[in-house]
Amino acid sequence: MSTGDSFETRFEKIDNLLRDPKSEVNSDCLLDGLDALVYDLDFPALRKNKNIDNFLSRYKDTINKIRDLRMKAEDYEVVKVIGRGAFGEVQLVRHKSTRKVYAMKLLSKFEMIKRSDSAFFWEERDIMAFANSPWVVQLFYAFQDDRYLYMVMEYMPGGDLVNLMSNYDVPEKWARFYTAEVVLALDAIHSMGFIHRDVKPDNMLLDKSGHLKLADFGTCMKMNKEGMVRCDTAVGTPDYISPEVLKSQGGDGYYGRECDWWSVGVFLYEMLVGDTPFYADSLVGTYSKIMNHKNSLTFPDDNDISKEAKNLICAFLTDREVRLGRNGVEEIKRHLFFKNDQWAWETLRDTVAPVVPDLSSDIDTSNFDDLEEDKGDEETFPIPKAFVGNQLPFVGFTYYSNRRYLSPANPNDNRTSSNVDKSLQENLQKTIYKLEEQLHNEMQLKDEMEQKCRTSNIKLDKIMKELDEEGNQRRNLESTVSQIEKEKMLLQHRINEYQRKAEQENEKRRNVENEVSTLKDQLEDLKKVSQNSQLANEKLAQLQKQLEEANDLLRTESDTAVRLRKSHTEMSKSISQLESLNRELQERNRILENSKSQTDKDYYQLQAVLEAERRDRGHDSEMIGDLQARITSLQEEVKHLKYNLERMEGERKEAQDMLNHSEKEKNNLEIDLNYKLKSLQQRLEQEVNEHKVTKARLTDKHQSIEEAKSVAMCEMEKKLKEEREAREKAENRVVQIEKQCSMLDVDLKQSQQKLEHLTENKERMEDEVKNLTLQLEQESNKRLLLQNELKTQAFEADNLKGLEKQMKQEINTLLEAKRLLEFELAQLTKQYRGNEGQMRELQDQLEAEQYFSTLYKTQVKELKEEIEEKNRENLKKIQELQNEKETLATQLDLAETKAESEQLARGLLEEQYFELTQESKKAASRNRQEITDKDHAVSRLEETNSILTKDIELLRKENEELTDKMRKSEEEYKLQKEEEISNLKATYEKNINTERTLKTQAVNKLAEIMNRKDFKIDKKKANTQDLRKKEKENRKLQLELNQEREKFNQMVVKHQKELNDMQAQLVEECTHRNELQMQLASKESDIEQLRAKLSDLSDSTSVASFPSADETDPNLPESRIEGWLSVPNRGNIKRYGWKKQYVVVSSKKILFYNDEQDKEQSNPSMVLDIDKLFHVRPVTQGDVYRAETEEIPKIFQILYANEGECRKDVEVEPVQQAEKTNFQNHKGHEFIPTLYHFPANCEACAKPLWHVFKPPPALECRRCHVKCHRDHLDKKEDLISPCKVSYDVTSARDMLLLACSQDEQKKWVTHLVKKIPKNPPSGFVRASPRTLSTRSTANQSFRKVVKNTSGKTS
């Protein structure tokens, strides 16, 4: 500043510095400084200094007054705590005087100074305060006291995007919308000169209209002039951090804004798939996948993701040199993924969001999780004995968005300030503040009006949709009426049919009555005959034979008379029933006619209702037009209001005299607006109520029509059913009467014969029923077997489908090659026409090709015969092996039975020994004899035991020989198959090459002929007849060529089928071999257990020797261990949790069973060789940061070779070529630089190795996972022990196991550590660093732990 300036200009510049909110010496900053000094000096030990005491006595009272006047936490009432982190919490608050709702963030000064991170909040404050962007959460106020920093921000009631993704399955349409909003928000932050560096769904909040805003700017960093950032620590969340940020740890990190676009790609993938693309259970796994992103980025097959979305994700998740967005945000906006018909980039904020939060009030917190109360003790600054300055780092933090302590600078005012009264200036300043508050309120009212207009538009759309639905309902009603008419016609037709059937029934009834009358006449005749017979009996009383015959005749006649009487009574009953049925039919006919008339009346009523509905619909359409006109008028009034507001602001700036007039106009406008709004709302409510009434009336009418229709239909159906039942009863009764009449003519003898016949039939039918029940049981058993076979066939079909897909791909490649060949042939055929000499040469070539094809056929036949012979030999070998296996199984069963018998004998001997011991107390002599007998029995048992052990050893040797034979035969079979396939491929390639050479020769010859001069001259002289002959010959040759092609294609299809069959057989044999190996391993463990029991038996039965506990057999295997452990389900703990399995550890194998039933059936799901075991260790929180904290002490990790694993349903994983990672070799370790944000200690010096924000540089061995400070290696300190693991990382696998308790975990770890072989497995020599892949690179990723470390770090 030049000293020549006047005092007024100097004062004016100072005044501008004091007013500027971005200045470091503004009024708020100076007040913060005085406040901080008073806080830091007001202690008894410091007040002993006179200067400090005088300063405090002078300024303490005024500072206390200023503290009461400035904004403080007591000005707000807390509604609810909606978030909590490491430095404090976020509260939903309401201002006591204005009753406005805000989100207030509290940051503990003690925690920030303790963790030496007292500068991260400045960027957050500046971005939210000065962003002036709709995509960034706005900061209204920032203030402080002696314990906390307070940031009063706008409340986002929609919650974060994590909550949205957990409640909805996000479709691609929604993902496009939210990704576009994130892109615009990041562009706003980049335009301010900052990089966010922690873009994730947790930091994306939704406002009340469902639109997105970015928050949490604590990781932001200012860019230099080149748009780059230099940082030596990696900042961010592990799943969203970019490779260039990870590489910056412990080194010179230099990157730009493209690191934020990487996080956008991860966010888009997570929305569409449901999980992050580089998910792993450990930080090391996540870090290695991010560094190897070219190979580890994959898309699931079951998700329907568009090509544009995949392209955009791949463009984001790539190297920073070619990443989308490196050259500006415009290239992102031009991507095809963002093309749509619903919104544009310029109007994205004005469009309706996919999810608008349903809020009950302005303090609705339904989209936030309920948090428990923080019961921990809050730490504060200790009382210092000397000046510390704890409050000085926070000077200047205070900020007010709409408050100024000083008047606005104006040179004219400064010149005339001496003439203006101070009281007038103060009054004007107050009026300006009031106007600013009123303006702020007017802006809020304007926003509310716009929101109400949007809601009214939405309601109108809903009303239109409801009207359309009502129109559809009316159409449905009309269709139902037409259906009712059709049904009425059908019912009329049915009534006519029923009348006709009733007439037929009447005729039948008349016929039955005639038959009854004839039966009566017959009865009277029979009575007369009986009377005559009685007279004859009186006259011929002398003859006994005639009397007896007459008596017999009387008996029979009396029986027939009784039957006829019974039949007569039954006929009379049936006639009466038929008459009653006829009456009922007549009544039903009358009821049907009445119902028909009723349906006609209902139909006419429905027509009248439909006409009334049509009139109401026209009236509703007119009302909708009126509403639309009113809405347009409302929109015009809103525009007029906006124009008035702008005019008022201009008038306020021009002159202060017009302020009173503008206030009056504004008040009038407010009254008018409120009155119009109320009137419009009342009209809308009236119209909505009218619409609801009309809709209810329509629904009631529709329901009454449907109910009447359903009642009529039910009555008609009931009547029809009753008529049908009555008709069936009548017909049955008529049939019974006819049968009874016919039974009168049948004799008793015939009935007896029929009875006997029926009894025989009954017995025969019972036998048949028994046979059928047996057949049914057999069929059910067969059905169960068929179901099991179907399951196995379905499993095989799935495998065959996978093979079919692979073969289809190969066929497609062959077809493409074939198409290319056909295209070349087509070109050749075009050139053939019109060439006599060329045709002769082509004929020669065709003959040569035919000769080659015949040779090819003969070769194929020979190969097929050889393959069939080899297949037969292999089948024979397999059958022999199976027979040997069955014999071994029988021998094993015999051995088990022998062992059981020996166990029984041992039990008997133990009982005898117990009795002998009791009797030994009574008599010593008897005891000696029994001891001698028992010694003999023990000797016998020992002999049998030795025989059994020899048998078991022989069986084990035979088993090993068989397994060796199996392996050798499988290897030979594989080699033979590979040789056959290679020979076939070679023959095919030779044939293709010969054909290609022939074709190239033909093309070259054609070119030579065409380029000859003689040919050109002869071509001119050629006649038309020659040309025709050539064309005919060409056609013949073309036909022959087509035939040869078809034959060739048929041969290719045949060979392809044979190859498919062979590959399917190979897969089946491999799966069968794996199952056999796993079953053998389980059987071996069972045999081992039996041997251990036998050894225990021999030890316990040897009474004479009584060996001590220390004298054990060194040849016996170590003690087994078995129990329940949990493994990661589907390899993903976060989504699927843990899966329980029963684990058995024998001397050679580790067996995993799904349950105990599988263990009994010797059916393991996975088997590991103990010889291939490398390392066993407990895990730390950094290894499994996805797991719960209480589970970490129960988890341990095992490392083993790929070759030592055998599991069911093995899927061959593609070998990924990973990028080379830099690691340091030291004492066999392969150290990778990393940082720890979770609790971890150095294993060399036992000091802390972690920090939440600035952890020290660390190293971790990717073999044995030893952790240490980097300084130990840099300073060459001899504190690190050599690496305990010696294996190739690329050929090893690891597995996490969860025990039931911490003691169980220790037991498993100690047992498995003893099982690890001292020498590394064969074939696993330590690899050099250059040849190692980075498939399991152990680098740690970093996370800004705010939520997870709350309460843990103090």
UniProtKB/Swiss-Prot annotation:
Domain RhoBD: 949-1015
Expressed in which tissues: Detected in corneal epithelium.
Stretches the record annotates as Interaction with FHOD1: 368-727
GO molecular function annotation: ATP binding; protein serine kinase activity; protein serine/threonine kinase activity; Rho-dependent protein serine/threonine kinase activity; small GTPase binding; zinc ion binding
Description of activity control: Activated by RHOA binding.
Region: SHROOM3 binding, residue numbers: 707-946
UniProt keyword terms in alphabetical order: Acetylation, Apoptosis, ATP-binding, Cell membrane, Cell projection, Coiled coil, Cytoplasm, Cytoskeleton, Golgi apparatus, Kinase, Magnesium, Membrane, Metal-binding, Nucleotide-binding, Phosphoprotein, Serine/threonine-protein kinase, Transferase, Zinc, Zinc-finger
Region called Auto-inhibitory, residue ranges: 1115-1354
Classification via PANTHER family: MYOTONIC DYSTROPHY S/T KINASE-RELATED (PTHR22988), RHO-ASSOCIATED PROTEIN KINASE 1 (PTHR22988:SF33)
Function: Protein kinase which is a key regulator of the actin cytoskeleton and cell polarity. Involved in regulation of smooth muscle contraction, actin cytoskeleton organization, stress fiber and focal adhesion formation, neurite retraction, cell adhesion and motility via phosphorylation of DAPK3, GFAP, LIMK1, LIMK2, MYL9/MLC2, TPPP, PFN1 and PPP1R12A. Phosphorylates FHOD1 and acts synergistically with it to promote SRC-dependent non-apoptotic plasma membrane blebbing. Phosphorylates JIP3 and regulates the recruitment of JNK to JIP3 upon UVB-induced stress.
Name of the protein in question: Rho-associated protein kinase 1
Organism for this UniProt entry: Oryctolagus cuniculus (Rabbit)
